[in-house]
């Protein structure tokens, strides 16, 4: 009689599919939300009962945004059920021409390519935190998961390869050279070790100037 409804963590028809929260951060979006929709045969293509909107801040991670949307989804679902109960639903057909489809996150997407810009890598790190987490490796072959970073607006010498530790910021952490500046590592986890702050990484000399971080081929662990 009433149909089956669902909560989807994006502003449909954008980001239909398996990884809408990751994708919003990876793409540097500043707004997302939830859609309360009717389920039909197509993937996330049913009529939308209502949308609830949410800002994505520069500091949001997959984890924090997931929690915001969970709350928003619960509120939206309550409103939608009330509309259905009162016979006040004015569902909106989705514009399929504006639909984007997102697949599950792959292991490949979690590897950091230091030839990318600081913005791309910064979004990759927060968009995959806490899981599967963006990762790199060092010249010793250790896999390193990076959980938090900060963009550094600075020009480093062209001769220095991207992925090289170019600077140590006192009481903060190591800076890695990328395509258009640097990225300060604030939280990372070495294979088999616990999560460390950037300051502890430099104090323990786990990363030193001149060391190279690589596009990791090791499997996620």
Residue map of PLM features:
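Alpha-helix N-cap/helix-start motif
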Residues: 14-18, 114, 194
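An anion-binding loop in the catalytic cleft
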Residues: 115-221
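Active-site loop ensemble at the mouth of alpha/beta enzyme cores that anchors a bound cofactor
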Residues: 102-104, 109-112, 117-120
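Donor/substrate-binding cores of folate-linked one-carbon enzymes
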Residues: 1-104, 108
């Amino acid at each position: 009689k009433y149909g089956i409804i669902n909560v989807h963590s994006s502003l449909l028809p954008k980001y239909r599919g398996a990884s809408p929260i990751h994708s919003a951060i990876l793409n540097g979006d500043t707004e997302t939300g939830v859609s309360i929709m009717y389920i039909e045969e197509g993937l996330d293509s049913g009529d939308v009962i209502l949308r609830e909107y949410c800002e994505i801040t520069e500091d949001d991670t997959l984890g924090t945004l997931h929690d915001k949307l969970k709350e928003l989804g619960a509120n939206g679902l309550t409103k939608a059920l009330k509309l259905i109960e009162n016979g006040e639903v004015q569902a909106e057909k989705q514009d399929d021409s504006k639909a984007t489809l997102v697949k599950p996150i792959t292991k490949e997407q979690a590897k950091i390519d230091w030839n990318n810009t600081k913005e791309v890598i910064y979004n990759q790190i927060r968009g995959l935190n806490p899981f599967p987490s963006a990762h790199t490796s060092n010249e010793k072959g250790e896999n390193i998961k990076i959980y938090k970073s900060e963009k550094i607006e600075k020009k480093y010498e062209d001769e220095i390869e991207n992925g090289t530790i170019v600077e140590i910021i006192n009481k903060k952490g190591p800076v890695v050279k990328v395509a258009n500046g640097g990225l300060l590592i604030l939280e990372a986890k070495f294979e088999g070790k616990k999560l460390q702050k950037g300051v502890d990484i430099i104090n323990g000399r786990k990363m030193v100037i001149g060391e190279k971080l690589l596009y990791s081929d090791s499997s996620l662990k």
